[in-house]
């Protein structure tokens, strides 16, 4: 029993040391976080990244380096954003992943914030470490207003083939209006991106019927997909009868084979509605259909405009335009 006081004394000393160590470690983390923020505000991104690496162990999406301007842009707080800009904060501050405040504003669809940033010198074509631009983010959110503002300030509508493609993102999300705006800026409707294919192929993969229809109307190649895989292959995999019917009406070739040597019909489940839809179009097309396809092919991508200049009867115009 005489050893009991000594035991409790050692226990209290141990607990005190443990609590002191824990508090000291917490204090260091708080200090480093404040130091990180200081370096971000001063614009020393390299040092901020090094400190964040020590604190967070190299997490790929660290939110600790988001400036107040990032927060204001992401939440659409225009007054706060303008106040920060007036105080002299750099509008082109980026996070460790190269995300700018303009990226945040466009991802949130906050067009007023995006415009304010652009008017104060924000880089319109800034890229994140993943190659995403503010225009890509605007297409992701489906903000046609942001897309228009970015294009007015010189945003590149079409980037290099290996960067994140705005039109593919718009189609993937089903944002037809954003897609149409980009196409008016001479974006290549046949642009094939590795792992994604053409915009039409993406639309078929994600069953974006409105986008499929509009792309076909605007002259997208009905058989150009992802390498040897056609849009029809993608539609069959998704069991989308509506998309299959659209593609076949626009002249999709049922006999084309992919890298595995399979046609769209080979991929269809036996006795399914998809297979029945394909079989309905397996025979030779009508002469009127062949003529329509031939005329549209000769006129090219601008056929939807050129047809009106031919001086044809209204009924024939509507037939050629699939109306």
Swiss-Prot record:
InterPro entries noted in UniProt: Ankyrin-SOCS_box_domain, Ankyrin_rpt, Ankyrin_rpt-contain_sf, SOCS_box, SOCS_box-like_dom_sf
Subcellular location(s) of the protein: Endoplasmic reticulum
Residue windows of the ANK repeats: 64-93, 97-126, 130-159, 162-191, 195-224, 227-256, 260-289
Pathway where this protein functions: Protein modification; protein ubiquitination
Disulphide bonds in the chain: none
Subunit: Substrate-recognition component of the ECS(ASB11) complex, composed of ASB11, CUL5, ELOB, ELOC and RNF7/RBX2.
The name this protein goes by in its record: Ankyrin repeat and SOCS box protein 11
Organism expressing this protein natively: Mus musculus
The organism's taxonomic lineage, starting at the top: Eukaryota, Metazoa, Chordata, Craniata, Vertebrata
